[in-house]
Each structure stands twice: as structure tokens, then as C-alpha cells.
């Protein structure tokens, strides 16, 4: 009788163990390798940069015509590629020349400044064919106001910002004086769009700011005092708009 009971019990035990074994993963199993994202090539990184900067231009233009958007896109991407290739060949030389220009500018001697700027202009003259072709391609798709939008985007809006600041700093500017300032700033912008860095773009604007301020001095403005008055006014305005902060409970006044 005992042997009969054991015979009945044994299949049930084996079935139980087989279920437990199936429920547990094998200790020797190997997990599948994790897929790694492919490392982008330098060309792919460059292309991503061209697309990013092109989107910035298109966002500011706010074009609605798909065909024009596509044309401006292709023009901008091609220009960024030409621009990067040119800077790869010339940036080492330009870095040294801009350093010399900075030293010359500190002397406040216009002859020294002009002499230091001359070789920089000579280097950038080699990019002029690409610059002119770029402007011609834009002119075939965009109106003059839209081209100015492109130029302002490429120079981080330095022209309108600087022009408006001059109006606040130097009171009573005549229409002729305003026209002179705007013309110089437009020349600065035209040169700065080819620059390789933010600092270099700013340097082109400084070049023409110096000329504007020399002009305003000749026009009877006290440039240094005008700047001091403007800074003092801005500080007073900021102080007036800041809320009074009361001491917290328990703090000593």
C-alpha cells in the first residue's frame, strides 16, 4: 500500500519541480548586448550646425511660402559651409591679427589702429567673392528689408541695439547725424556677418563705433560725459524699480 501511495505522489513532485524551473531564468544565460548609438562624423556635426543656424534665420524671417523657405534654406546652408571652410584656413592668422589690433586700439592712436586693421581687411578681402555671391542669391529671393533681417540675425542684432543706444546716450541727434551713425553701423554689420566668432563680430562693430564717436566729438558732443550720464541714469532707473525688501521677522534692521 505504501509503495502504491509513493507511486502516486512521485509524478506530482516532479511536475512541481518542473514548473519552478521554468519560472526561473537560467543562471548561465547571457543578456543581449546593448545597442550603442553611432558616433556622428565631423561632417554630420557640421551639417547639424548649418541646419541649426539656418533655422534661426528662417524663424526670424517668418516666411510663409514653402518654395521661398526651401530656397533660403539651401542658400544659408551652402553659405555656412563656405564660411566654415574659409575660416578653417584663415582663423589662425586672424587670431594673431586681431590680437595686434586690440593692442593698437588701446593706444587710442588712429594711425596705429588703421595700420593694425589693414591686414585684417586684406585677409577678409579673399572671402569677398563668396560674400557677394551670397548677397546676390538672397536678393533673388528676399526683399531688402528681409535681407537686413538675415544680416541682423547673423550678427546677433548688434545694429538695432547699438543704434537705439546711441539715441538714448546722445540727446538731440539731428537727422544727418543719425544717418551717419546708421551708415557706419550698416558697414560694420556687412563686415561682421563674415566673422568667425562673437568676439570678432563685436570687434568689427567696435571699429566703426570708434569712428562714430570721433565724429560725434567733432560735432560738439562730450562723448565720455554722455556715457557717464547715461550709466548714472540707468543705475538710478534700476534702483527706482527695485522693490524695498523688508527684513524678515526676527532679523535686526
Protein language model features and the residues they cover:
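Charge-rich (acidic/polar
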Residues: 24-253
